[in-house]
A protein has these predicted regions:
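Phosphate/dinucleotide-binding and metal-coordinating scaffold of catalytic cores
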Residues: 1-331
């Protein structure tokens, strides 16, 4: 979650609603040059849902129906957390088009007409690998961008500084084994229609598992982490404004590497059936769960930071080691 102090996001780049309709973590100024490639201004709509108060904390809407991307009714006023935070100028036709898409999404009919199926499944594969409770699948639901084009929706990543279980603060073994088929950490998948359609369909669930298998087989987590650490280490060491010591940075890197390798092992087991991929299944039989008791999640950061203790709204303590400074930096 950001700690920016602007009260409402300015219109900005290309085509999304509640996530770029950013549902409830209002973004700071977000010029098109800082959006992902291909996300420049267009006739489509972008936004994030939710405003912030002067302390940088959300005013509301973090778990409202529109932030969850539920269909409410046909009145645009019922979707204020979306439309009040659009990142581009939007028309009445834009509003009605999005509402129609949300209605069809909630009904679960002809999903491919209103969702970019491939993009959204791939989004949730990576999202569910990193165990981010500060997100659409967690307690702070508003942390995403939603991209809309011609009535079809997709998700854009946002706010992952408390991923890898550091938001939840739960035990490491539980987090490493987060079930990929029931990833909601707070609430039910039934009220998260942008995710629920995957698991309501055997075809889409199989595709989700296929993409998950391809992801863990195709990514060398240790190599990426080590290469990135080597690249930024000299700057971390010399940073005069650092709020973590260099030793804490190194410890965070070691823990992140270990977490990803253990998470990879758990996901592989969940895909091949040696570990249950659901919360209920893991509760019934935990014998095959991957033991992650050797790592400490807070080494990668926490809600309160590691220096001075305690949560401080609108401060850098609301971030983990190596997180980007508060400002306009985007994923």
């Amino acid at each position: 979650m950001d700690s920016g102090d602007d009260e409402s996001p300015a219109p900005d780049s290309h085509g999304t609603f509640p996530g770029n309709f950013d549902p409830a973590s209002a973004t700071e100024e977000n010029p098109a040059s800082q959006m992902p490639e291909g996300m420049g201004p267009s006739e489509n709509t972008a936004n994030r849902s939710g405003l912030k108060n002067t302390n940088g904390m959300p005013k509301g809407g973090m778990g409202s129906e529109d932030v969850k991307l539920q269909y409410i009714d046909d009145d645009p006023d019922s979707y204020s957390n979306i439309f009040d935070n659009a990142k581009t100028d939007i028309s009445a036709a834009d509003r009605q088009r999005l509402i129609r898409s949300l209605k069809q999404l909630s009904q679960g009919e002809n999903i491919e007409d209103v969702v970019d199926v491939d993009e959204v499944i791939r989004y949730f594969v990576v999202h569910n690998f990193v165990c981010n409770g500060d997100s659409y699948t967690g307690q702070i639901i508003h942390n995403y961008y939603l991209y809309e084009e011609d009535g079809r929706l997709s998700m854009i990543p946002w706010d992952y500084n408390l991923a890898f279980g550091t938001f939840q603060g739960s035990d490491s073994t539980k987090t490493v084994n987060t079930p990929i088929d029931t990833p909601i950490s707070s609430g039910s998948a039934d009220d998260r229609p942008m995710l629920n359609w995957i698991f309501k369909s055997e075809e889409y669930t199989q595709l989700y598992h296929q993409y998950f298998a391809e992801f863990i087989e195709g990514v060398d987590f240790a190599e990426i982490i080590d290469a990135t650490a080597e690249m930024i280490a000299p700057y971390v060491k010399k940073d005069p404004t650092a709020f973590y010591s260099y030793q804490e940075f190194e410890s965070g890197i070691d823990t992140l590497r270990a977490f990803c390798l253990l998470r990879e092992e758990s996901v592989e087991g969940q895909i091949n059936g040696t570990i249950s991929a659901t919360t209920s299944g893991q509760a019934e039989d935990s014998s095959a769960l991957i033991d992650a008791s050797s790592i400490t999640l807070s080494d990668m950061g926490s809600m309160g930071g590691s220096v001075g203790g305690g949560f401080k709204p609108n401060s850098d303590q609301f971030r983990g080691p190596g997180a980007a400074p508060t400002g306009n930096t985007k994923p």
